Design a protein with these regions (language model features):
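Long, low-complexity, charged/polar intrinsically disordered regions in eukaryotic proteins
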Residues: 2-50
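Short amphipathic alpha-helical interaction segments
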Residues: 88-99
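Short, amphipathic alpha-helical interaction segments positioned at domain boundaries
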Residues: 117-152
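Long, Pro/Ser/Thr-rich low-complexity/intrinsically disordered regulatory tracts in eukaryotic proteins
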Residues: 152-241
Length: 265
């Protein structure tokens, strides 16, 4: 029988200690198991040793978990729908949803025919594990979210990466090249050009910190880059980043030129 492939997290090398409650919080257990896409964690009860538990427990209150447990992963719900599902008054619920969005447990957009605000409980990666790491002060207050992000990028795919063909087969993140890098190509698709996306979203554009760089630096690792302004949000995501203190609005082409210079340093 082959050895297990799991690469354990060496907590002794972290510049912080991951707190693991002696008495598990049941609502956090349920929420972690509901969101995770890690197969072993779906098939058994979570423990305080699981990153799905201690990652959420560090930043999510039981009241937040109550609301999130009324949702389904990646299924949008409007405020009236959530009001009905939770039984909470609209004003109280809206404030709580905003707090959940600020910490990064929820995202929101207006992507429906009525342009009505809708809330989404995302998966961990891509999703809340990244959002947890897009606020410098939040990382300082809850450094365990950095290790949680690392675990949620590694563990769900550890047994299948050897089977993924070149190109990724639709798994993971896909890169849009710097526009100048494809100017000399004979053929390229519109969606391969950053300018296509900027025009599509009519210049609504925000820049935020790189959650990858910022989290690894907090773990005592990383590449040494300045983490600010690497991540781009367009359209509704731009509003989400700004309104939840994860980014700032930016002038698209000015920012991209600065970004190209920064990347080439």
């Amino acid at each position: 029988m082959s050895e297990p492939t799991a690469f354990p997290l060496d907590e002794s090398k972290l510049p912080f200690k991951i707190p693991k409650d002696t008495k598990p919080r049941e609502k956090i257990m349920k929420l972690g198991q509901m969101i995770t896409d890690r197969v072993p964690a779906k098939l058994r009860r979570l423990t305080v040793e699981d990153p799905e538990y201690w990652g959420l427990a560090s930043i999510v209150t039981d009241e937040m978990a109550d609301v999130a447990l009324k949702m389904k992963v990646r299924q949008p719900m409007t405020l009236p729908e959530l009001e009905k599902a939770t039984g909470k008054p609209a004003k109280e619920l809206e404030l709580l949803l905003y707090q959940m969005s600020c910490v990064g447990l929820l995202e929101y957009n207006w992507e429906n025919p009525r342009r009505e605000k809708q809330y989404i409980l995302p998966m961990f990666v891509p999703g809340s594990a990244e959002f947890f790491n897009m606020n410098k002060q939040q990382i300082a207050d809850h450094p365990e979210v950095t290790a949680f992000f690392e675990r949620m990028t590694f563990l769900p795919l550890e047994h299948i990466t050897a089977m993924v063909p070149p190109g990724g087969a639709g798994i993971g993140m896909h890169v849009i090249p710097v526009e100048k890098a494809i100017e000399t190509e004979n053929h390229s698709l519109d969606i391969e050009h950053i300018s296509h996306w900027l025009k599509k979203y009519q210049g609504k554009y925000a820049a935020g910190p790189c959650s990858c760089r910022m989290s690894r630096a907090a773990m005592g690792e990383g590449c040494g880059d300045d983490p600010d302004d690497w991540c781009i949000g367009v359209g509704d995501m731009a509003d989400y980043l700004v309104e939840t203190n994860k980014g700032h609005y930016a002038v698209s082409y000015t920012h991209l030129r600065a970004h190209e210079t920064k990347a080439n340093l």
